Amino acid sequence: MLTLSKFHVILIPILFFITLLSPLFSIALPINIWPKPRFLSWPQHKAIALSPNFTILAPEHQYLSASVTRYHNLIRSENYSPLISYPVKLMKRYTLRNLVVTVTDFSLPLHHGVDESYKLSIPIGSFSAHLLAHSAWGAMRGLETFSQMIWGTSPDLCLPVGIYIQDSPLFGHRGVLLDTSRNYYGVDDIMRTIKAMSANKLNVFHWHITDSQSFPLVLPSEPSLAAKGSLGPDMVYTPEDVSKIVQYGFEHGVRVLPEIDTPGHTGSWGEAYPEIVTCANMFWWPAGKSWEERLASEPGTGQLNPLSPKTYEVVKNVIQDIVNQFPESFFHGGGDEVIPGCWKTDPAINSFLSSGGTLSQLLEKYINSTLPYIVSQNRTVVYWEDVLLDAQIKADPSVLPKEHTILQTWNNGPENTKRIVAAGYRVIVSSSEFYYLDCGHGGFLGNDSIYDQKESGGGSWCAPFKTWQSIYNYDIADGLLNEEERKLVLGGEVALWSEQADSTVLDSRLWPRASALAESLWSGNRDERGVKRCGEAVDRLNLWRYRMVKRGIGAEPIQPLWCLKNPGMCNTVHGALQDQ
């Protein structure tokens, strides 16, 4: 137990550069909160013990109450011991008995743009800390911050006192995409990912559920899609699984955004409905054909036939089931990589083209037949950028109403973001040059001669590997010159495509690289002078990575442990903590 005089010097973790009194003045202080808050003041550098009877006092709420219970248990059980210790004055006169949570508007739903701001204060001389938020979701962000300020072994827990934090995100959409079609992930894997996202203040789990390789989602109105299109009967997601994941997301302040990729990437639909899928189960790149004549961009062929009335009967059933199972207000309809060669294998489509029709008109017909139906279900439609920007098959903007359509980038870095914004569309940034977490792991084709080429990137089309530094330093609104353009950038997502990933590598592929995205989209990647702070962030991210591991997240290391125990010794210039 703690036996102290008026003040007692104890040891707490290094290293957090906080804003002290003024956002223009920073000094090194031993608090590590990830992502870094927008404003933090701790002028007296004092700490107090947490009462053995500490409680969190919060109003009852369907989702916040579960969060309060979770954080109370975490605070008592985490037993976080700092890897590096620095002295701080611990006050003896009293202990912190409770955290009082106040939410001004519990009616605010978990959707894009909801207020996630919070204010957190632990006054000197008070038995209570205070957390004020406009929404339940902002309160959850504040609870996470509070949990990260606590260290010690229960019941001897400590935290800073005389501290004030005012915090809110720069971008409303901060997400992780996980592809569960190419390889299957268990429900526990998905829930663990959502838990880690919440700890990093990420708020959108983009669930790329289906693709050509499998259709793992059991739908009440179309059960044959999963029965015949999944990778196996034990590799499906039932309605009960979906309900559990969605509920878990709400309890962690994470939206679950479903993606049913169409009309491309639908080979798995052909197992149940071969009559609505063109080029299903054909070899993806026929012998003697050029790349332009391929049937798919990777193994797993199949695209929905826009000329078949049966297509829309099935698709609308799928949409209705998705709307019923997912309360999320965004519906991701895919729309990427519609390949000309696949559609051209169908006689009816060839007849349409011979009569003067175009492939782009086929895409427009599909969108015109599905987008209004999605909108009628009170959903905003998200498509990949291809529907507007593809060089061969794209839709006229007239069929993509800006008030109902959001586009997600994945090519050409900031250039495609600029093009989408210039066209007046809202955009979610997932540039493969920066945010694709599968890149740099080689290829998966069995006999690709590119592996023998010295400058091939090891067979990975999007090599090199996207480091946490690359992710952290990327400015998603780069080159947008005015505030109106920047407002159209909703945020960003890192993407884990699963050609070479499954549950065995899930945590290490995501973390802590997704943590780098989390801070850059929450509080930015620059210091108060406008200088990139990647160099300063490395120690903080390293500490956060170790804490995530203690919380059960298998985040990969970013440095030798020796570097963390010897601050500054692994820099390129001794004592240099800022990027120039």
Curated annotation (Swiss-Prot):
Tissue occurrence: Expressed in roots, leaves, stems, flowers and siliques.
Main location: membrane
Coiled coil: none
Family: Belongs to the glycosyl hydrolase 20 family.
Glycosylated residues, chain numbering: N53, N368, N378, N447
pH-dependent activity: Optimum pH is 4-5.
Signal peptide residues on this chain, from the entry's feature table: 1-28
GO molecular function, one term: hexosaminidase activity
Keywords: Cell membrane, Disulfide bond, Glycoprotein, Glycosidase, Hydrolase, Membrane, Signal
Role noted for this protein: Has a broad substrate specificity. Can use synthetic substrates such as p-nitrophenyl-beta-N-acetylglucosaminide, p-nitrophenyl-2-acetamido-2-deoxy-beta-D-glucopyranoside (pNP-GlcNAc), p-nitrophenyl-2-acetamido-2-deoxy-beta-D-galactopyranoside (pNP-GalNAc), 4-methylumbelliferyl-2-acetamido-2-deoxy-beta-D-glucopyranoside (MU-GlcNAc), and 4-methylumbelliferyl-6-sulfo-2-acetamido-2-deoxy-beta-D-glucopyranoside (MU-GlcNAc-6SO(4)) as substrates. Removes terminal GlcNAc residues from alpha1,3- and alpha1,6-mannosyl branches of biantennary N-glycans without any strict branch preference.
EC category name: hydrolase
Catalysis: reaction(s): Hydrolysis of terminal non-reducing N-acetyl-D-hexosamine residues in N-acetyl-beta-D-hexosaminides
Activity regulation remarks: Inhibited by N-acetylcastanospermine.
Name this polypeptide is given: Beta-hexosaminidase 2
Organism: Arabidopsis thaliana
GO biological process per UniProt: carbohydrate metabolic process
PTM per Swiss-Prot/TrEMBL: N-glycosylated.
Protein EC: 3.2.1.52
GO-annotated cellular components: plasma membrane
